[in-house]
Amino acid sequence: MILETPDFQAYRGQEPPRFANKAELECAKVLDYYGVPWEYEPKTFVLEQDEDGRVVEAFKPDFYLPEQNLYVEVTVMKQSLVTRKNRKLRKLRERYPEVRIKLFYKRDIERLAERYQLELAS
């Protein structure tokens, strides 16, 4: 899915962001509106490698907020399908304890959308 993106002022990435879903786009708009510097999917964290050193599992958080040194992952999956993502986050925290990351669930995004009158796909 390719979503048309506005001309972001607080975006700090090298390439224009290509959001995976409308929730990510709307979160980016909120960050930008408040002037919070952000990057989109700037880093991939290796979670597991095979015996030859090939990456078996990795995780790429949606946003990085450099001034807060915080990664943000947005998930709009049904709560019952979030188990795999939570497992990846646990692995990331075990392997990279210095990395700060926050997961926003579908209900968090819905509350954000209601509060800021965002247009999110159901």
Segments predicted by a language model, with ranges:
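Electrostatic, structured charged patches in enzyme active sites and in nucleic-acid/phosphate-binding
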Residues: M1-S122
